[in-house]
From Swiss-Prot:
Chain intervals for the UniProt region annotation (Acidic): 28-40
This protein's name: Calmodulin regulator protein PCP4
Protein origin, superkingdom: Eukaryota
Keywords of this entry: Calcium, Calmodulin-binding
A GO BP entry: negative regulation of neuron apoptotic process
Domain IQ stretches: 39-62
Sequence positions bearing Blocked amino end (Ser): 2
Tissue specificity of this protein: Restricted to the nervous system. Expressed throughout the brain, in particular forebrain regions, including the granular layer of the olfactory bulb, and pyriform cortex. Also expressed in the hippocampus, caudate putamen and the cerebellum, where it is associated predominantly with Purkinje cells.
Stated role: Functions as a modulator of calcium-binding by calmodulin. Thereby, regulates calmodulin activity and the different processes it controls. For instance, may play a role in neuronal differentiation through activation of calmodulin-dependent kinase signaling pathways.
Amino acid sequence: MSERQSAGATNGKDKTSGDNDGQKKVQEEFDIDMDAPETERAAVAIQSQFRKFQKKKAGSQS
């Protein structure tokens, strides 16, 4: 789980993000083995959380 925290994700409060507006953003390429068991487990977990979110969102709008 520590890999997730150190992945460089920000919460929108980063003051230096505006400094790079003039620079071209380079997209990182990831080589992810889509057949790996841990990748499948991660995908299922993400989908499950997304479905819960959608269900909660739909329930609050009614």
